[in-house]
From Swiss-Prot:
Binding residues for [4Fe-4S] cluster 2: C223, C227, C230
Composition skew (Basic and acidic residues), residue ranges: 15-24
Organism of this sequence: Lysinibacillus sphaericus (strain C3-41)
PROSITE patterns: MTTASE_N, MTTASE_RADICAL, RADICAL_SAM, TRAM
Subunit structure: Monomer.
Residue positions binding [4Fe-4S] cluster 1: C77, C113, C147
Protein name as annotated: tRNA-2-methylthio-N(6)-dimethylallyladenosine synthase
């Protein structure tokens, strides 16, 4: 599976007047923004993180959204999707009404992703497109938030080339959305509030969940791994874990509300709890507590092999509502490339980890992420990635061609692998990925699987669609009233990436055993 397949599941430059001196934008960054710095970021400490449990919207903002609508377009990962749920919750507490028609919105937010240059280009293109709506409705507020906002080069570009944008804010101050909106309504200049501070943990933020079947729950924020290709440690800040009692309470509330599946989110969930100074409590402890809650399925993303410990494996082996699917990004099968990437593990370490997981959970499905064409990658090193994929027997993968991200150490490396070589390697890798995915799904032909029905198929309204515990897509015909329920389906046909089945029955509601 390539990036295009992954994303499928989900510029107007203003002329400058020559007779005026160029505006000095540095003032925007003196207090609220610091450019990404690997050296400075690695020095960041723990003492600045504070926990706030008393979030509420001040009375001064009451009625702000009366007779006004909002629209949020989200780019990128599940973390961004969850941030959108929070912002939608804040909007609705302010009295705004959501709309799906962007040109009719009174406030438009682009919640951005900085992981790849292609994602950023889409945002700039959308900003140019929004200008025509702004001209028709000068009262429309346009805002840019999310990871791109944490990059100084991006904010500078918006300030210079997209003056119709009204507000820019970062990932650390979503809770200040009411203040930012108020200032945008009152100000004649673009409101820029991007904190270089690494962020606190804000509890009790309102949320407008995007669905009623599956829910995302943040367990931590940020990342301290500093892989040389990745911008996330700069845009999301240092690792900071939510307190376990807050997470457990949220999951209990979701279970009581009828949710069937919880996805625990973090840039590196396996580092959960490492920053606690008063308790010894890691991801394995959290999963052990959550498995006792009466909710059918719990899964997590994203894992880092370096922090995947034996206790977590031991807990996952207890199964119950802990699913048998682990997404474990390896990125490369070459020790030399892993070292350049600063992944801090070796091929041998990764294979030993996989061996432990498979020994404890024989039915486990493993999926991964892989980058090809990294600086200095040789044909032999790429072949090592192919051999590792076969040795592990991954059942699916998100595959990418390397592209440099400004502000990362890798961007300073010579990108010396020709583009045609990168594309050829990606094609060869995807052939292997497709082969192993097809074989894995073919083994299910004739088997009965448990499916959480999420709705109708994207292609046919008379076909239902859902996912197995191992996150495999299943399409089948059945009664619409089973949407939102767990059902048993017999597999009758397979493709490289999905299954077709025959509806059998609804799964009986069984209490989760402790």
């Amino acid at each position: 599976m390539n990036e295009e397949q992954r994303l499928a599941n989900q510029q107007v430059n203003q002329p400058k007047k020559e007779d005026k001196p160029e505006k000095d934008y540095s003032k925007y960054f003196e207090k609220v923004f610091t450019a990404p710095s690997l050296k400075d970021a690695k020095k960041r400490g723990k003492e600045d993180v504070k926990y706030h449990k008393d979030f509420s919207i001040d009375e001064q903002f009451a009625g702000m959204g009366k007779d006004r609508t909002f629209y949020i377009r989200t780019y990128g990962c599940q973390m961004n999707e969850h941030d959108t749920e929070v912002m939608a919750g804040i909007f609705m507490q302010l009295g705004y009404t959501p709309t799906e028609i962007i040109e009719e919105a009174d406030v438009v937010l682009l919640n951005t992703c900085a992981i790849r240059e292609n994602a950023e280009n889409k945002v700039f293109g959308e900003l140019g497109f929004l200008l025509k709506y702004k001209r028709k409705n000068p009262e429309m507020l346009i805002g840019v938030c999310g990871c791109m906002s944490q990059e100084e080069s991006v904010v500078n570009k918006i300030l210079r080339s997209y003056p119709h944008v009204d507000m820019v804010f970062g990932t650390h101050n979503i809770h200040r959305l009411p203040n930012i909106l108020k200032e945008a309504y009152m100000s004649k200049e673009m409101v820029v509030e991007v904190w270089s501070k690494e962020g606190d943990v804000i509890e009790n933020l309102p949320k407008k969940r995007l669905g009623s079947i599956k829910a995302w729950v943040n367990i931590m924020y940020g990342c301290d791994k500093f892989c040389t290709y990745c911008i996330v440690p700069y845009t999301r800040g240092k690792e900071r874990s939510r307190r376990p009692e807050e997470i457990i309470a949220e999951v209990r509330e979701l279970a009581a509300a009828g949710y069937q599946e919880i996805m625990l989110l973090g840039q590196n969930v396996n580092a959960y709890g490492k920053d606690f100074e008063d308790i010894e409590y890691r991801l394995g402890d959290l999963m052990d507590a959550l498995r006792k809650i009466d909710i059918p399925r719990i899964r997590f993303t994203t894992s880092h092999p370096r922090d995947f410990d034996d206790h977590l494996i031991e807990v996952l082996a207890k199964r119950g509502n802990l699913v048998e699917h682990i997404h474990l990004p390896v990125q490369s099968g070459s020790n030399d490339i892993l070292k350049i990437m600063a992944r801090k593990y070796t091929r041998e370490h990764f294979l030993t980890l996989v061996e432990k997981i498979k020994a404890a959970i024989p039915e486990v499905t493993l999926t991964t992420d892989i980058i090809v064409g990294y600086p200095n990658e040789t044909e032999e090193q790429f072949e090592e990635t192919l051999s590792l994929y076969r040795e592990v027997g991954f059942e699916a993968a998100f595959t990418y061609i390397y592209s440099p991200r400004e502000g990362t150490p890798a961007a300073k490396m010579v990108d010396n692998v020709p583009e045609e070589v990168k594309k050829e390697r990606l094609q060869r890798l995807n052939e292997v990925v497709g082969e192993y995915s097809r074989k894995a799904l073919e083994r299910l032909n004739g088997e009965v699987v448990e499916v959480l029905v999420e709705g109708t198929s994207k292609r046919r309204d008379d076909v239902l669609a859902g996912y197995t515990r191992k996150n495999r897509l299943v399409n089948f015909k059945g009664p619409a009233e089973v949407i939102g329920q767990l059902v048993k389906v017999k597999i009758i046909e397979t493709t490289s990436y999905s299954l077709t089945g025959e509806f059998l029955e609804v799964v009986k509601n069984e209490k989760v055993e402790a």
